[in-house]
Curated annotation (Swiss-Prot):
Molecular function GO labels: structural constituent of ribosome
Family: Belongs to the bacterial ribosomal protein bL33 family.
Listed InterPro entries: Ribosomal_bL33 (IPR001705), Ribosomal_bL33_CS (IPR018264), Ribosomal_bL33_sf (IPR038584), Ribosomal_zn-bd (IPR011332)
Domain of life: Eukaryota
One GO CC annotation: ribosome
Disulphide-bonded residues: none
Principal localisation: plastid
Subcellular location: Plastid, Chloroplast
UniProt-listed SUPFAM superfamilies: Zn-binding ribosomal proteins (SSF57829)
Keyword Nucleotide-binding among record annotations: no
Protein name as it appears in the record: Large ribosomal subunit protein bL33c
The gene coding this protein: rpl33
Keyword Chloroplast: yes
Amino acid sequence: MAKGKDVRIRVILECISCVRKGANEESTGISRYSTQKNRHNTPGQLEFKKFCRYCRKHTTHHEIKK
């Protein structure tokens, strides 16, 4: 039987370059990736280098709050 909340949760990673660019200029969109993380192993926020199709390069993607 499972105890308490689920250990694995779904998180959304968002490109920080698109978010910053969107405030200053007109942006075509914001790159987002969906993934899972284990709360016990990674209690902090996730940060990955992933490909952003709007920036057309590999950029840092941070976990966003729901």
